[in-house]
Amino acid sequence: MTVTDIARRVYNHTWKLDPICRSLLDTDFYKLLMLQMIWGLYQDVDATFSLTNRNHRVRLADEIDEAELRAQLDHARTIRFSKKEMIWLAGNSFYGRKQIFSPEFLAWLADFQLPEYELRRRDGQFELHFYGRWMETTMWEIPALAIINELRSRAAMRTLGRFALDVLYARAKAKVWEKVERLKKYPDIRISDFGTRRRHSFLWQRWCVEALKEGIGESFTGTSNVLLAMDTDLEALGTNAHELPMVLAALSSSDEELKASPYQVLKDWQSYYGGNLLIVLPDTFGTESFLEDAPGWVADWTGFRPDSAPPIEGGERIISWWEQHGRDPREKLLIFSDALDVDTIEQTYRHFKGRSRLSFGWGTNLTNDFDGCAPEKIDRLKAISLVCKVSSANGRPAVKLSDNPEKATGRPEEIQRYLRVFGSRNRVHQPVEV
């Protein structure tokens, strides 16, 4: 276990550049899984990723110094995969499978460099875009979000003295540990760390991972952060994300192709992966529409990740669909991951225990819960909902509808077209905090 005095390190911050991104493995595992598929099937596709701050009241460009942000983004572009990292990717087993990454893909990955970016300020916000081939721009999503979130944390703490920083981190540690102790009551619960993109800092995420490892033992199944998985000998976890159906939908040339695009993604995915990686993410264009038109073979997949509906409501919908298709939900897996905290984890676990296999991906409320921890009130330490989504593919606008309309992204006229094709049933407005 690596022990770092985080408060001292923050206070002694006197060097010119303290890199936030130190490795290209400091990303979510599903980015690498998706990248291999994109590299194999869609090398000629362009995709633009764009930053969106859902908390409009937070003026990011007023909180974060633009020169500092550029310096961090520029530094990230200098990083390459190390020999040690490439050997680990080639030789390690993931999800019980050896050589999950092909030698040809790894040979390409060894020379990978993050592409250029475009950054400007407008009305107190940053407009940050990444243009280029999909297999290059996709790798910006996680480091860009981690960089901005950590710069915001650093800016918020800049006025705190050494003693105040000690108090801040002592309270934050106690807050996390109290949550961990609550989870000890459920020895067969399964928890994983999904907190990279909106974390307080890399060092803090590492501490949270160590706390879960120490506190709940085998109930802690691993982390989505590939670098932390390698460094702490944990399982690297993750399946697929909304960007896959968003891009394929944007490339569609007709309403029929658009309607079929989520299922084409699944066909592509199962040509590369199997077993516990066969997890359906149904909500990109609305879960109700997805389930209504899903081919029968989708019911044979290992499980679902109901991401944007309230967890109990979303889980019940999936269980009902499995039963309608003659499948036993007790043999299937539900992965919950949307804005979870210990209260929702406990409630959801108790509700579904014994009815399905369960797993919980704990994100922002694990790795960035500093609200109320400072000796004085600092609003900027409260986590915000920041995303970096596909905004276009081959020049065509991309859309995400979601089960929560507050999470929808895309041009208004395109959102209306997608709603005409997919419908709007059972989409429920909920406030988006993280």
From Swiss-Prot:
GO molecular function: nicotinate phosphoribosyltransferase activity
Residue numbers carrying Phosphohistidine: 242
Organism domain of life: Bacteria
A Pfam family that the UniProt record links to this protein: NAPRTase
PTM annotation: Transiently phosphorylated on a His residue during the reaction cycle. Phosphorylation strongly increases the affinity for substrates and increases the rate of nicotinate D-ribonucleotide production. Dephosphorylation regenerates the low-affinity form of the enzyme, leading to product release.
One Gene Ontology cellular component annotation held by this UniProt entry: cytosol
Pathway assigned to this chain's UniProt record: Cofactor biosynthesis; NAD(+) biosynthesis; nicotinate D-ribonucleotide from nicotinate: step 1/1
Catalytic activity from the UniProt record: nicotinate + 5-phospho-alpha-D-ribose 1-diphosphate + ATP + H2O = nicotinate beta-D-ribonucleotide + ADP + phosphate + diphosphate
GO biological process: NAD biosynthetic process via the salvage pathway
Keywords in alphabetical order: Ligase, Phosphoprotein, Pyridine nucleotide biosynthesis
EC number(s) on file: 6.3.4.21
Matches recorded under Gene3D superfamilies: nicotinate phosphoribosyltransferase
Protein family (similarity comment): Belongs to the NAPRTase family.
Function: Catalyzes the synthesis of beta-nicotinate D-ribonucleotide from nicotinate and 5-phospho-D-ribose 1-phosphate at the expense of ATP.
Protein name: Nicotinate phosphoribosyltransferase
Native species: Chelativorans sp. (strain BNC1)
Biological classification of the source: Bacteria, Pseudomonadati, Pseudomonadota, Alphaproteobacteria, Hyphomicrobiales
